[in-house]
């Protein structure tokens, strides 16, 4: 989940800024406010201008918001809007909508069927994934204060393309079997 998440993130960024590079800091834990904030601060000190996370606290958003205003840095959240935590740096984010999966998984169990046989998604062994087209992924609110002009229209267009299966994230040169590929 983490590797596919940050791979999708850099692919999206490079669709707008092809020369963008990404530095990843691992915390090796889902929830550690201090460690997440320190990692974000280190990335900001190294010159990163967009910070995101695949962890569960407000630490990275707070680090962005506390950055000296002479150094532009923006924050994109994961699973929760951070607009109230980082009102001058938060751009937008995505979240996982667990409702479709839970409903289908419970229905499978009640019917005494394998969950994988009853899920409307992409099955990978015992794992399953889906996107905007099945409403498993949703956009969080766009911060109109920090977002560039035209961001709303661009996001809406891309989400519609995903829903119509006119756009795929994982195609092209990004393939591998481990994080070092």
Labelled PLM ranges:
Residues 1-181:
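A residue-level marker of the well-folded mature domains of exported/periplasmic proteins
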